[in-house]
Amino acid sequence: MRTLLLVAIGLLFVFAANGQTAYVSKVKKWRADHQTELLSDSGWFTVAGLFWLQSGVNTIGTGPEYDIKLTKNFEQGKFGEIAFANGSALLTVANGVEATSGGKPISSINLIDDQKSDPTTIIVGSQSFFVIERDGRYAVRLKDTQNEPRLNFHGLKWYPIMPKFRVTATYQAFAQPMEVLIPNVLGSTFKMKSRGILRFRMNGRPYSLMPVEEGDHLFIIFKDLTSKTETYGAGRFLYAPKPANGKVVLDFNKAENPPCAFTEFATCPLPPPQNRLNVSIPAGEKRYHD
């Protein structure tokens, strides 16, 4: 009888170890995929500029005299101009400049911003740009596949994967969706809707986070005490599956830096007051820049 008990206990340890190994492997793959996405031809490490559009003519080219400054990889000087008024942007390309959109050559085109369906992207050599809309303001976001931060990438930094930072939260739905004021790096706020609150325990103490919905996931913008020393100072992002039977798994081993951790040309949301936690969560992604 005792022998059987020892065998059973041994098997439990083996199963637990195998389960933990499988979990660590899954998180490692997720982290590798996350890095691949950041470094892709359209990833955040290619972002090379952000230029707010002014009413009237906005010139585009390489050099300090232009309103929208392409990188040095465009060697022809003047690229063209954007005539902007009341959210409408008309691009005219200078004579002799080759540019495409949707795989077709262009000389003039209306630029559809990123908040509408089928936004317009302009390609010129290794660079691309498109119009974004944020809080009623419009800007041109520039990307370059030969961007120096991408070419000089030196690896993401992570805490060791620890299963204890994968916690199960209780999801308490609101009677009605609640509007949450989300601040951003532009100094303004915008409204998002939250349908409930997540309650969980860490180190024996209760905490809560207010998520918003993004596609098929919950999106959590949070900040913890590690932001003072080891993680990005403005906070981090965490995605989680939508609740099942009133429960949500929060895997802080997958906590990730916002785009602003890698480029000054992003327009990141910041944690609302409800999501600033008075606890250290040494899990997930660390600061990219020391």
Which ranges hold each PLM region?
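N-terminal beta-hairpin/loop module of FHA
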Residues: A22, K26-F74, L225-T226
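Surface-exposed beta-loop interaction hotspot
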Residues: I123-T189
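Flexible, glycine-rich surface segments
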Residues: F165-S227, Y232
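Boundary at the C-terminal end of the N-terminal hydrophobic targeting segment
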Residues: A17-T21
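Bacterial N-terminal signal peptides
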Residues: L6-V14
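C-terminal soluble interaction/assembly domains
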Residues: T229-N253, N257-C260, P272
